[in-house]
Swiss-Prot record:
A lipid is attached at residue 27 (S-diacylglycerol cysteine). It comes from Burkholderia lata (strain ATCC 17760 / DSM 23089 / LMG 22485 / NCIMB 9086 / R18194 / 383). A lipid is attached at residue 27 (N-palmitoyl cysteine). The keyword Signal applies. It is a lipid-anchor. Its main location: membrane. This is Flagellar L-ring protein. GO terms for cellular component: bacterial-type flagellum basal body, distal rod, L ring; cell outer membrane.
Length: 230
């Protein structure tokens, strides 16, 4: 049996190659930053303890007046968002240009060249034509419900809401995140509002799992894809 002994330099090169391969494999999945950066929930401030008045009704315990509806208006209140997004977009463009040119002139000859090039002339013709068309269309539909929490109350009374829903299905973890600004006047009696009535709405649907990792190209692969000439 023939034995092969690696020189120190060859050993170092082999170790570097293994390290680069492991680094490239580890970079196959690049985490994506969520579009919603604000907190997903909020808790109301702890109310100050009040001395019991001795009656049946305790305003400090109830948290809201007796004859007030249950619509959210304070930090920590919850609200149901009815997601009903349907967006269609179509775009088309075209361009057409045509340019032609023709040049014809005689070349004067003198002396002994007259016999050879007596009828010599030059002509040039050019034609440039360009035609292009393009089109794109997109259709997105997103329906569902998510319950969010009031994280802030603006000075004008509008509510800043955000929330997250996580679902573990088989071996994949799916996320639904929502944030926006809600006008309390648009909230129905069922304590819900449509997403189309929410200002600055940010809706995110993503997943984590082996299927999502298989569909994501690593940054090192994207680098070689951009510089490859084929």
């Amino acid at each position: 049996m023939k034995q092969v002994r690696l020189l120190p330099s060859a050993t170092v090169r082999a170790a570097c190659a293994v390290a680069v391969a492991a680094f490239a494999a580890g970079c196959a999945q690049i985490p994506r930053d969520p579009i919603i950066q604000q907190p997903m929930t909020a808790q109301p401030p702890t109310p100050m303890s009040m001395q019991a008045p001795g009656s049946i009704y305790n305003p400090g315990y109830a948290g809201r007046p007796l004859f007030e509806d249950q619509r959210p208006r304070n930090v920590g209140d919850i609200l149901t968002i009815m997601i009903a997004e349907n967006i269609n977009a179509t775009k088309s463009s075209g361009a057409n240009t045509n340019r032609q040119g023709n040049t014809d002139f005689n070349v004067p000859t003198a002396g002994f060249l007259g016999g050879l090039f007596a009828k010599a002339n030059l002509s040039a013709t050019g034609n440039n034509k360009f035609a292009a068309t393009g089109g794109a269309s997109a259709a997105n539909t997103f329906n569902g419900t998510i319950t969010v929490t009031v994280t802030n109350v603006l000075p004008n009374g509008n509510l800043v809401v955000s929330g997250e829903k996580q679902m573990l299905i088989n071996q994949g973890n799916e996320f639904v995140r929502f944030s926006g600004v809600v006008n309390p006047n648009t909230i129905s009696g069922a304590n819900s509002v449509y997403s189309t009535q929410v200002a600055d709405a940010k809706i995110e649907y993503s997943a984590k799992g082996y299927i999502n990792e298989a569909e994501t190209m690593g940054w090192l692969q994207r680098f070689f894809l951009n510089i490859a000439p084929w």
